[in-house]
Amino acid sequence: MTFRMGALAAMLAVAGLTAGCQTMDVGGLVGAGSKAVQAFSLSDQEVVALSDQSCKQMDAEHKVASTNSKYNKRLQRVVKPLTKQLNGQTPNFKVYQTQEVNAWAMANGCIRVYAGLMDKMNDDELRGVIGHEMGHVELGHSKKAMQTAYGLSAARDVAAATGNSVVTQLNSSQLGELSEAFLNAQFSQSQESAADDYSFDLLTERKLKTQGLVSAFEKLAALDGGESSVMSSHPGSKERAQRMQQRIDAAK
């Protein structure tokens, strides 16, 4: 994901372009700018609270596999040897019953895996991908992504400053927009590499097979034609597979 730092500048540019056309609520614009600035300094508790709301909204919008479903039973078995606290948060794992190939994790430990991904991965590959998502939480990448998503939502306050009602709380629609912004953000290549290494190290520490990381990335690379949504936030899978193979070879 690419960490966007230009939200405030973009908002102020919009304000400048529209100021000559209509009467603006300056106080509202100041509030919008303040919200964008504050977004990048949200406390851990605030990010977790936003993630809690966003995760609940995502769960409400998707068909979640039941406790007794084959998908949930398999997922819980796969993650059992990986489970640990992530930045003080207890991870919770659920499956979305959709054929989309995707997985993501939020700063509150909300980790969601799509059935389409599970169908294409064996257990070792699935652990590698999930370990990667856990890495984004532990290393603070998911926190930064939520801060960025929230900061970009400040653009709505610019519209409010032109005369629309001011949004004081996130309703279902706004939570949906926040969740979409979070999922559509992109981590940097360095963040992706760090999460790959986190997964490799976690698997090694737990004495689990690491070769699945390589084959998982190879499968994702083969899906680069558009079938895999996970590819939009996980670029360069072929190169990453090669790097993981180099780590495996070096450890022999």
Where in this protein do the model-derived segments appear?
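Sec-dependent N-terminal signal peptides
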Residues: 4-14
